[in-house]
């Protein structure tokens, strides 16, 4: 569980570099896609850590193997926790965005580079500001999950 948290921290460092260095200077939709993949990877690790924590505390018997069942388990375990639910839903939405192959790039190599795609019948725009927003939510989620897991360890 602590190893998974450490992996998540390292992945968060990679996301930080992507967002504040690579994306800032490259300004392409490919970099937006890459940042989304890294954010998803970080969420995967943090959610895995929460599931390991739940298993260790005997709230679940085993950790689900598929992303959908992991999401459902987390939503059931933490149904009272709005912050976790919000982040689990964002993670799910980002996974859907990542799977979309057809998107339009506009204003590449400029400040307002935008990836436009259609998701569930709606046109969605993802730009650098949105990536910053997702990254900030991810940082908050990382701190929150760490507090849940490590905070419990310190109390014992």
Range-by-range predicted roles:
Residues 3, 10, 37, 41, ...:
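Generic recognition of short, well-ordered alpha-helical interface segments
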Residues 24-60:
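N-terminal interaction modules that seed assembly of large macromolecular complexes
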Residues 1-34:
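Charged alpha-helical initiation segments
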Residues 15-26, 49, 53-56, 119, ...:
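Secondary-structure edge/capping motif, primarily at the C-terminal ends of alpha-helices
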Residues 11-18, 38, 45, 137, ...:
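Amphipathic, well-ordered alpha-helical segments in soluble domains
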Residues 6, 33, 37-40, 129-132, ...:
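A generic "alpha-helical surface" signal
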Residues 134-156:
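Long, hydrophobic alpha-helical segments that serve as membrane-spanning/inserting helices
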Residues 57-140:
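Long, charged low-complexity segments
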């Amino acid at each position: 569980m602590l190893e998974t948290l450490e992996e998540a921290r390292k992945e968060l460092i990679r996301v930080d570099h992507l967002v504040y260095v690579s994306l800032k200077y490259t300004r392409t939709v490919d970099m937006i896609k890459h940042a989304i993949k890294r954010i998803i990877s970080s969420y995967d690790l943090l959610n895995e850590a929460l599931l390991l924590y739940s298993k260790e505390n005997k709230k679940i018997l085993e950790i689900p193997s598929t992303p959908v069942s992991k999401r459902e388990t987390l939503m059931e375990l933490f149904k009272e926790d709005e912050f976790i639910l919000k982040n689990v839903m964002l993670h799910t939405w980002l996974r859907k965005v990542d799977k979309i192959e057809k998107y339009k790039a506009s204003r590449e190599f400029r400040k307002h580079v935008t990836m436009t795609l259609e998701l569930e019948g709606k046109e969605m725009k993802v730009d650098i500001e949105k990536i910053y927003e997702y990254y900030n939510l991810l940082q908050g989620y990382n701190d929150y999950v760490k507090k849940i897991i490590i905070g419990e360890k310190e109390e014992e």
